[in-house]
């Protein structure tokens, strides 16, 4: 029995360590900061769809629904966190989708209006560029909320605590 528990703990620790190699480590976001970002930085409009890049335990998705998002979509590579997210959001059936996969190779849903990301300083510019590609393809502006890091080389339009808002407009002259 003890060996089984130790084995499960070791597997869980390994999953968290391995997923941290491919992206940002899991750091829970404070609910109060998320609430503040969604009320002061970028309040939701009626048909807003939020995509969370590296959705972790689903707290951002949950708070986005509470704040008025019509739909939320999360991408997470840690299967344990995907399960926790699904459990957290189970009362919101039909308003959330969580994918167990990397977001780097996905095409954004056509109706995405807000992208939320906590990325390490080495990745946040690449995430911004990914959202710029999505904006170019859709021909629509997408608001990008970065938690914890500013995007180097770009000016944010607003800041609330550790959240930075960027309004990404399509660049029609670029090929995507």
Locations of regions flagged by a protein language model:
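Conserved SAM-binding strand-loop segment of SAM-dependent methyltransferases
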Residues: 92-103
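Conserved SAM-binding loop
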Residues: 85
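Conserved beta-strand signature within the Rossmann-like core of class I S-adenosyl-L-methionine
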Residues: 139-150
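Conserved SAM-binding loop of SAM-dependent methyltransferases across substrates and taxa
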Residues: 57-69
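Conserved class I S-adenosyl-L-methionine
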Residues: 46-56
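Conserved SAM-binding motif I beta-strand of class I
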Residues: 71-76
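A short, conserved alpha-helix within the catalytic core of class I
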Residues: 122-134
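S-adenosyl-L-methionine
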Residues: 1-45
